[in-house]
Amino acid sequence: MTAQGNKPSSHDVITGRWTPSAADKAAGRVSGFGVITNIINGGLDC
């Protein structure tokens, strides 16, 4: 549940401590389930 590389902590997203930057918003990343999915599966995890 710690931030890794360019991905925020999933805990911070769930608890509302993470807020999307202007670049995140422009890319369609906002707080919620979709961001959590990208944190878990969005890198080279698989």
Curated annotation (Swiss-Prot):
Pfam families from the xrefs?
A: Glyco_hydro_19
Please tell me which top-level EC class this enzyme sits in: hydrolase
Q: Could you state a single Gene Ontology molecular function term?
A: endochitinase activity
Q: Name the catalysed reactions.
A: Random endo-hydrolysis of N-acetyl-beta-D-glucosaminide (1->4)-beta-linkages in chitin and chitodextrins
In terms of SUPFAM superfamilies, this protein maps to: Lysozyme-like
Identify the EC number(s). 3.2.1.14
Could you list this entry's UniProt keywords, alphabetically sorted. Answer: Carbohydrate metabolism, Chitin degradation, Chitin-binding, Glycosidase, Hydrolase, Plant defense, Polysaccharide degradation
Q: Name one GO biological process term.
A: defense response
- Summarize the record's induction comment: By yeast extract and dilution. Slight induction by glucan elicitor.
Q: Which family does it belong to?
A: Belongs to the glycosyl hydrolase 19 family. Chitinase class I subfamily.
- What is known about what this protein does? Defense against chitin-containing fungal and bacterial pathogens.
Q: What is this protein called?
A: Endochitinase 1B
